[in-house]
Amino acid sequence: MDGFYPTNLKNAVIYAALILILLFVYGIFGSIYIMHLGVIDAIYYTITTVTTTGFGDIRPITPSQKLFTASLELIGAGFLLYIFTLMLSVMFMSFSEYVTGAKLKRKIASMKNHFILCGFGRVGSTAFKELKKRKQKVVIIEKNKDLVETELWSDPNIIAIPGDATKENVLRYAGIERAKCIIIATGSDVDNLFITIEAKELNPKIWIVARASERENISRLKKAGANRIISPEFSGGKDIYFAAMEPLMMKITVKHGMESIKREAEIIFKHNCTLENIMYHLPEFREPLKRKIEVSDLDHIEKFLFQVKKNPRLRESLNKMYESTSGVHSHWISGPSKENLEKVVEDLKKEGILLGVNLDDEKIKEITRKYGMLAEVMVKPEITVVNKHGIDEIRDEAEIILKHGCTIEDIEYYIPGFREPLKRHVGADSIEDIDKFLNTLKKDPKKYDAIDRLYMLSGGGIHSHVISARSLESLNKVEKELKEKGFLIGVNMSLGEIKEMIQKSGTVVDILVQHDVKNLEDKKTVVKYGGRILTSKHYLPGIRYVLTRKLNLKTMEDVKKCEKELEKPRARRTLTALYELSANIHSHTIVTPSAEITKKIEEELKEKGILLGVNFPEEKIWEMVEKEAVEPFCVD
């Protein structure tokens, strides 16, 4: 590893050499031009005068010669004193550096499961502060020797190495084989890449967090072995810290009252862990309320509890928060090792307050619904309402929500075949916003049809809104009136519950039929019962291609338009070919007002001999088509 030689010592040696050269130039030229000596005698006279060892064989006679000789002797004596002082400094600093280096080496050799931080710039120094706050052991490697010697070494609690982290011997000196994590935060992506490769080779199990200044280098660092890559463009030192601590963090979900706050903290701090935050899981809220804590000693908790005791308003607010969740809340905690975290879990279990470890949001919501009670808290509450109505009743629904001072935040449609709902931001807090939207629909028939189709596809008008309000009372009133109006299906339902309900409702189904192109009985039957045909799908064998036609038939007038369309020769030829290629088998996606009506449509189509089945899987449809198709459709 590079030696620890201060820059000012090197400068002193350079200055001494320059002074010596200038002194000799002055002495030699003065001896030639003032003492009138030859070159050899001038060199001899300069050396003997500067070193004060003159033998008296050459003596100054004139005043100018005497002044020159005196100045040369004075400068020489000063220079010799400077050289003597410099030698003492070198000896002292060499001894000091030996002692410092030995101490540093012993300290690092005794460390294990520590962090190595490469680079102590803006990002690195912030990450270091977060690590020290949590009492983590850190070795810093910094290229800038001045920074290490003047700033970092001034604090006896900081272990820092002046050196290049891209070099193997420097990483070994920092104890890379025994470290649990290396944070690579230098300003050079090239250096960061080399350090990542070197670190992975020296310790394949080490957790690597690397900084990437350029977006295109993120994938390179990932391939090189970095577990997490942080870009200062989007994040900072704190994010690097949390990425570094990821393997040593755990989410605990607990249940206890205010009286057990101190006891819970004692258990966590006893094992040298840090309380990073607290999350309150209110039953009526989509996301938990989060608050940073970032403490690792009991003094902070005791100060907080003293403030709670002293301040009635704070005590009342906190008490309501605990009441509203029945004491259910979560913490992210970090620790020096997995063993420490496991000990915390064991002790919390013994205390009888632990509900689970690293539970996902859905699981915590289940627990919250089980234990949680509604209570007014000093935040803006929100709920998700699942409603069912047609496009013509949008204003009626909005009036109920908005008249109680609530805001419609968004709308979600649940389309069959889609894993996630289609979500659209609304942000309406006045009826004028709704009227403006409805006027746009009236002026634009295409937009109206598109929204109408969405409503029909989404379980015949089933959709959800997140609505927010100033108080829970307002939300309760909205819930009650939506229920009375017949719009409300449920509150805060999960995606699985909504999809299951749509499936059971039987209002959106795919019917598989078989008939020739002139037969429109399937269309007439669906429309007659108030249903709607959204699409028609034809299955072309050979290439196994599904051709989908948008129909959107909702009245007998629409069916008559289909009949007129068939009278046109080109349209008739195209549709006839399509029907024949798929053996007259095709499917329709239909929407009906209720499951009962869907059943009636199915029964009538069966009687007419054209219904093959409902909601068949596509593979089964292909089997039927390919079995019946006389000439498979193919392209040369």
UniProtKB/Swiss-Prot annotation:
Disulfide topology: none
Protein known as: Uncharacterized protein Mfer_0534
Domain of life: Archaea
Keyword entries, A-Z: Cell membrane, Membrane, Transmembrane, Transmembrane helix
A single GO cellular-component term on record: plasma membrane
Pfam hit, one: Ion_trans_2
Species this chain originates from: Methanothermus fervidus (strain ATCC 43054 / DSM 2088 / JCM 10308 / V24 S)
Domain RCK N-terminal: residue ranges: 112-231
Transmembrane segments: 12-32, 34-54, 75-95
Keyword Transmembrane among record annotations: yes
Cell compartments where the protein resides: Cell membrane
BP terms from Gene Ontology: potassium ion transport
Gene Ontology MF terms in the entry: small molecule binding
Membrane topology of the entry: Multi-pass membrane protein
InterPro entries from the UniProt entry: 3H_dom_sf, 3H_domain, K_chnl_dom, NAD(P)-bd_dom_sf, RCK_N, Trk_Ktr_HKT_K-transport
